[in-house]
Amino acid sequence: MGETVDESMLFLNQDNHVLVDKAVAEALENKAECILCMDDAICSRVLKNLRERHVKIPEDVRVASFYNSTVLENNIPSITSLKFDAKELGMVACKTLLDLTEGQEVKERTLLPYEVVLKESTK
């Protein structure tokens, strides 16, 4: 809050390893302090790329994921993530879509509970 975001450092729709690798290279060139991944599959690829480049986590760059699945639970260092109820998120999204298709007014924003699980990758 209050921080400005450098939009040139936002890499959206990086859904294959070539795009992820390119985004990691660009983030490192631009001296990114942290790489925040949209899911654990992307985060796994980011971690592999960083290891191949001998980049130390969190000393050289911090890494976090928006999803707290079992995919990364054995990673060293442990990965900071968001913990939330994916089932509840899906139900709310589904209800919102149904309401929209029925012409009902929907909230612009729905906030659901979450927890930031701080681990070694961002210390």
What are these regions (language model features)?
Residues 1-123:
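Bacterial carbohydrate/catabolite-sensing allosteric modules
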